[in-house]
Amino acid sequence: MPKQNKYKGVSVDYRYGDESVARFINAVMLDGKKDVATRIVYDAFTIIAEKMNGESPLEVYRKAMSNIAPVVEVRSKRVGGATYQIPMEVKPSRRGALAFRWLKLYAKRRGGRSMAEKLAAELMDAANEQGASVKKRDEVHRMADANKAFAHFRF
């Protein structure tokens, strides 16, 4: 018998039938309130559909996720009393998780309006390669590029 059960995955969301959207809803969820998170995400998609004439909100979401997701990041490793920031490639599952986390964080930090409006604005900005979450991805990439000299210390 295995020590840990196999990962079962996430069921698809009921409106778009997309596993990535279901994962994003789970990332937006606070205190187990999935209905609230679902309403926020679907309202944001409705706002995107209204503002981006003719473009599918799912396509905007996918484009935003690909623009936010980091390819490399730095990880700390202690070697001989010194700690080095070592650039490492990001696994696909972590790539998505970081994109969700940054999108939620920077949408929440936007001023005023409802969370759905802030999330829609951040998604549209990210799809156009703007916004705070894209800047965060660029910052992470710059850190990895600056520490390229320590790449030979890989784990």
From Swiss-Prot:
GO terms for biological process: translation. Transmembrane segments: none annotated. This is Small ribosomal subunit protein uS7. The lineage of its organism: Bacteria, Pseudomonadati, Chlorobiota, Chlorobiia, Chlorobiales. It comes from Chlorobium phaeobacteroides (strain DSM 266 / SMG 266 / 2430). One of its GO terms (molecular function) is tRNA binding. Part of the 30S ribosomal subunit. Contacts proteins S9 and S11. InterPro entries: Ribosomal_uS7, Ribosomal_uS7_bac/org-type, Ribosomal_uS7_dom, Ribosomal_uS7_dom_sf. Pfam families: Ribosomal_S7. Belongs to the universal ribosomal protein uS7 family. It comes from the Bacteria. One of its GO terms (cellular component) is small ribosomal subunit. One of the primary rRNA binding proteins, it binds directly to 16S rRNA where it nucleates assembly of the head domain of the 30S subunit. Is located at the subunit interface close to the decoding center, probably blocks exit of the E-site tRNA. Keywords: Ribonucleoprotein, Ribosomal protein, RNA-binding, rRNA-binding, tRNA-binding.
